[in-house]
UniProtKB/Swiss-Prot annotation:
Organism this protein belongs to: Sorangium cellulosum (strain So ce56)
NCBIfam families per UniProt: rpmH_bact
PROSITE patterns, per the entry: RIBOSOMAL_L34
Name this protein carries in UniProt: Large ribosomal subunit protein bL34
Ribosomal protein listed as a keyword: yes
Gene: rpmH
A Pfam match: Ribosomal_L34
Length: 49
């Protein structure tokens, strides 16, 4: 049986990235909650080498 988590940076950014979060009201709430809590990373960032 194939495992469910097959990591891909593109999909990660599209579904959980900052732009995706800002696109919906719920996502904006997530970003604001993480800001309030003082998180260093608000959304998963994909770094270039």
């Amino acid at each position: 049986m194939k495992r469910t988590y097959q990591p891909h940076n593109t999909r990660r950014a599209r579904t959980h990235g900052f732009r995706a979060r800002m696109a919906t009201a719920g996502g904006r709430k997530v970003i604001n909650n993480r800001r309030r809590k003082g998180r260093a990373r608000l959304a998963p960032t994909i770094y270039k080498k």
